Amino acid sequence: MIDKAKLLALNSLKQSSNDLWSWHALLHVHDNENNDSINNNDDFNKINWSIYGPIKRHIWWHQSLILFYNQEYEKSLKLFDNYFSSSEIFYLDFCNACSFLLRLHYKGVDVKERMDKLKDYAEYFKNQHILPFIDYHLIFYYLYYNDQDYFQQLEEKMEENYLENSFKENYINYLKPIIHSMKTNELLNENIIKSQFKYLGGSFAQRELIFLSLIQNTKYEKNKSDLISEYNDYKSVSKLYV
């Protein structure tokens, strides 16, 4: 699958070297390979970023992940501060920033000042409950602050929204058990772990936050070992930083 994705991305870039979605596909491959060669690609470095919208910041997020995987934390923070940190209220920008900073936090890097700057955006999204993808980022964002008020009202507010929309099954079968496990310290069902949380939305690079956050916060060694095992089976570079 990875080889096919790489081939398709490269073929597409031969037709249009300015197609950011093709670069995005290639970066997914590079993330998995721990490959930073895109930084030396002449076509990539010639891109006029000023004409593009949020997708460019998502691409820079992918670049920062490669630096993270290589334990170049200061370089990755510089990329965050100079490029993909955004003052716009767009859900993907918030999710990108949140997931990146939490990764660094789990490695012992002080990100509190940067996390604090995301609070207004978190407040904007936290009661909407329109996408499980946004909500799982919010859950781990507020867990960083140990915000018990947020978690006490979370399930009730989510149920009001998700039980009435098309994400009902996604919420009941996947998101709710994660919340319940975190609140009660109960074991997370092994089948949920084996699903790689794909029904909560986003690519594996984005859902990676769920794995890393649960590994970091679970109180059960069985949950931790199951999460690490499933994660290592998928992510070829995972042993570098889990």
Outline where the language-model segments fall.
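Internal metal/ion-chelating core segments
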Residues: M1-N70
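Non-catalytic interaction/regulatory modules that flank or connect domains
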Residues: L131-I134, L138-F151
